[in-house]
Amino acid sequence: MLEQMLNQKVAGLVQLRLTLADKLKDTITHLNTLQSRVLDDELIRWKREQQLQGNGSQFNSNLDSIQEWCESLAEIIWLNRQQIKEAERLKQKVGLEPPGVADILPNLNNQITQLLSSLVTSTFIIEKQPPQVMKTNTRFTSTVRLLVGGKLNVHMTPPQVKVTIISEAQANALLKNDKMAKGEASGDILNNTGTMEYHQATRQLSVSFRNMQLKKIKRAEKKGTESVMDEKFSLLFQSQFSVGGGELVFQVWTLSLPVVVIVHGNQEPHAWATVTWDNAFAEPGRIPFAVPDKVAWLQVADALNMKFKAATGRLLTEENLRFLAEKAFRGGGQQQVGDYSTMMLSWSQFCKEPLPERNFTFWEWFYAVMKLTREHLRGPWIDGAIMGFIRKKQAEELLSTCANGVFLLRFSDSELGGVTIAWVGEQAEVFMLQPFTSKDFAIRSLADRISDLQHLVSLFPDVPKEQAFGKYYTPYTENQPTTSNGYVKPLLVTHVPGWGGPAGSLGGGSYPSTPQNMYQPQSPDPSVTRDTPSVASAVSDSVSSLTTVMEL
């Protein structure tokens, strides 16, 4: 009877252990699903939005929420791992080997440990990306964070993080083999090691590299039409730490977004083309750093719109985007509305092939316009005072029916980063002023130049120029004090020969004490109708002369 009772208890225990193993198995299945949702959906989405931020997209980071989910997962996984290990220990202690149980527990232990490993390695992330266009010998910053560091007590022995720069081919090899040759790198980075610190208030384990500097870069061999600005690198962040009193050791690494390395400022526009194309069209889970060679115009338009809005403060209109499509596809105005939407734009058309009869590409033209607007025209652009994206012929057609003195502003087709003023003269004739560039606006702003030119009366269609640009005029005081060194400061005023004297010479304007008719030929200078640079622009302020006014 005693033996029978013992056998019944043993059978009951075996059944309970089988039930426990089944429940643990179900728990791991649920954890797997949940972890996949957090890592493969939420964290991947966060990374994608972080990449689009590089193109100017608004980034509402929910990383703190993702950390909370990851910490909860880490806690549940760790507790279940302890349960499995305890069940294994009891099995060995009792010495019972019921059929079917002996193999389940080690297998479950492997599964739960793999889940933990995946969670830890996936949550070692770059919170603040390094600059994607990186100039050698220029300081830059970056921050990495371990989302589950606090929960797993990793900070008890703070891990070291090392940063190296690797090529596209090396990044490929790393993802395939999960390892790289020791010490292999594509350049030298100063101040490239740091210790992760735990911040009690935020419960974040992170390290900020504030003073890194790329000293040297090794380039790959170029093929065909490739340039150094097409070549992509990545910063590799590596660390190692243990959890559970050294029971588990994790080697973690993560790659930054693609980086283009330049040595000179004139390489910046093309480098940004590479980065913009990659950020916009990179697909999840791609081979580093593969991007499509052709993309639908609608996607390109979205990327350009996002970029322009971030730089200048205002989105492009449908008309603006149609103009850009026409320019990118070298359409010359023949295409009808909407024809471009399904067309595919190639990387070569985007930033390799020069525009017709020009020595610059579509991207170089767009980038120069965006830079000019950001640095010198932001206010009027946001107000809608700059039409900008309109062809010379269209501008002439619009103005041909307007009154004398009506003007509009358009970006030059022929000069990089140039904006020209088109206006109506006598007998409805339309004139174009030679384009102003950043160099001109560094001397005198657009609004002040428009104020100087008395023959400009109303912004198209009929907005008085004071209403459109008045708030951007530089305040003027008649009695200018002498500077600290005793000199009287001169004032530079824009004047178009043949179109009236400088402001004030007609009895009004912003600068009433400007001398009368210092330089006034009898007829308009024929070069004002051109929209091309001239030799004169190298020695004078565009085609307009600058009248120096001494305020005495």
Regions found by a protein language model. Name each.
Residues M1-N107, Q111-Q114, Q129, N153, ...:
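Eukaryotic phosphotyrosine signaling hubs
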Residues T121-T123, E127-S167, S234:
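Contiguous beta-strand segments within globular domains
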